[in-house]
Amino acid sequence: MLRRLLERPCTLALLVGSQLAVMMYLSLGGFRSLSALFGRDPGPTFDYSHPHDVYSNLSHLPGAPGAAGAPLAQVLPDCPERSPFLVGPVSVSFSPVPSLAEIVERNPRVESGGRYRPAGCEPRSRTAIIVPHRAREHHLRLLLYHLHPFLQRQQLAYGIYVIHQAGNGTFNRAKLLNVGVREALRDEEWDCLFLHDVDLLPENDHNLYVCDPRGPRHVAVAMNKFGYSLPYPQYFGGVSALTPDQYLKMNGFPNEYWGWGGEDDDIATRVRLAGMKISRPPTSVGHYKMVKHRGDKGNEENPHRFDLLVRTQNSWTQDGMNSLTYRLLARELGPLYTNITADIGTDPRGPRAPSGPRYPPGSSQAFRQEMLQRRPPARPGPLPTANHTAPHGSH
């Protein structure tokens, strides 16, 4: 029966036509659609072997020295959704480390406090870049040199905040980010909060520093440290973006993670428990290079992280922005960034070994999966709003 069908001319013509149609579909981008259905969309193709200089096209921006000035009209048009000044992959070099004076000279339109606003059009996003920091001056200069032109080409209104932890106690990245969010929101009603590690430099300016109104974005999806792929599906470290409402809906970040490790997985769990989902740019776009460095004194591996992660689903509504206390020591408007120096206290547990369950080396990924699959508790009551004030005697 099948043989007789295949011998008919009309059947053969139908099979050949179907094959040609499939080939045509794939050649016109259908493969990308199938990838989106059955896996992560790899996104557009970029040639990272021939990157552009990170300062490319900066002189072409309206209002730049030598460029056409901004129109005199009182009402400016909206900036395009995708800036015409983008170049794609940009070169990232770790040496020589530029001086602050050199960075200022190359970014003449950046204003006091690290603020920038495009000329000639109304920006579609006001983005605050918040960088936790301590004893990484070379890394900070590399980031500032790289990030300012990167963001200007995207035609965003932005400000860079560097949150400096005072003292020599154990580093607390997540708590510093909470401090940065609160201080940034006191300055302006930002549309988007970009939480940015100091040692990560973006490699593609099509990776737009804007938020997704549908949910938190994890932006550093392809780091050279991990072979330009995600280390595990729920990873939320490096660079992330949230609207102020999203940040407050999940009660910000935890304050109790002193030292290296654990807070990223706590944050990913908070996103889910708050009823939100993580989105990401295509892998081909979210490329980052990490500045090489040795382990930091005061940022040793956190021995308590697994015990804290066990409690996340019960503690996230009590530990975060609504429990944040710190002492503001300085607020300085530098030419390239706003410096916030804060005393955030010290680890109340000290360096002693944790109590409770212990987990063998190599079990962290299985542990993450277990934590992220637990059912959320009942929805909490209202969390603090962006204009929430700190307890008396603290910020």
UniProtKB/Swiss-Prot annotation:
Native organism: Rattus norvegicus
Query: Which residue intervals make up region (Disordered)?
Result: 341-395
Its placement in the membrane is given as: Single-pass type II membrane protein
State one molecular function term (GO).
beta-N-acetylglucosaminylglycopeptide beta-1,4-galactosyltransferase activity
Disulfide pairs? 79-121, 192-211
In terms of Pfam families, this protein maps to: Glyco_transf_7C, Glyco_transf_7N
Q: Where does this polypeptide localize? A: Golgi apparatus, Golgi stack membrane
Name recorded for this polypeptide: Beta-1,4-galactosyltransferase 3
Which GO BP annotation is one of this protein's? glycosylation
Q: Its family?
A: Belongs to the glycosyltransferase 7 family.
EC class of the enzyme, as a word: transferase
- Cytoplasmic compartment spans: 1-10
Q: Which key words are in the record?
A: Disulfide bond, Glycoprotein, Glycosyltransferase, Golgi apparatus, Lipid metabolism, Manganese, Membrane, Metal-binding, Signal-anchor, Transferase, Transmembrane, Transmembrane helix
Q: Which residues lie on this side of the membrane: Lumenal?
A: 32-395
The positions annotated for binding UDP-alpha-D-galactose are 132-136, 171-173, 198-199, 228, 260, 293-295
Query: Cofactor(s) for this protein?
Result: Mn(2+)
For this protein, what reaction is catalysed?
an N-acetyl-beta-D-glucosaminyl derivative + UDP-alpha-D-galactose = a beta-D-galactosyl-(1->4)-N-acetyl-beta-D-glucosaminyl derivative + UDP + H(+); N-acetyl-D-glucosamine + UDP-alpha-D-galactose = beta-D-galactosyl-(1->4)-N-acetyl-D-glucosamine + UDP + H(+); a beta-D-GlcNAc-(1->3)-beta-D-Gal-(1->4)-beta-D-Glc-(1<->1)-Cer(d18:1(4E)) + UDP-alpha-D-galactose = a neolactoside nLc4Cer(d18:1(4E)) + UDP + H(+); a beta-D-glucosylceramide + UDP-alpha-D-galactose = a beta-D-galactosyl-(1->4)-beta-D-glucosyl-(1<->1)-ceramide + UDP + H(+)
Residues that bind Mn(2+): 199, 293
This protein's GO cellular component annotations are:
cytosol; Golgi apparatus; Golgi cisterna membrane
List all annotated glycosylation positions.
Answer: 57, 168, 339, 387
Annotated pathway? Protein modification; protein glycosylation
**Spans through the membrane:** 11-31
According to its UniProt record, the EC number is 2.4.1.-, 2.4.1.38, 2.4.1.90, 2.4.1.275
Question: What the protein does?
Answer: Responsible for the synthesis of complex-type N-linked oligosaccharides in many glycoproteins as well as the carbohydrate moieties of glycolipids.
Top-rank taxon of the source lineage equals Eukaryota
Q: Which residues hold N-acetyl-D-glucosamine?
A: 262-265, 305
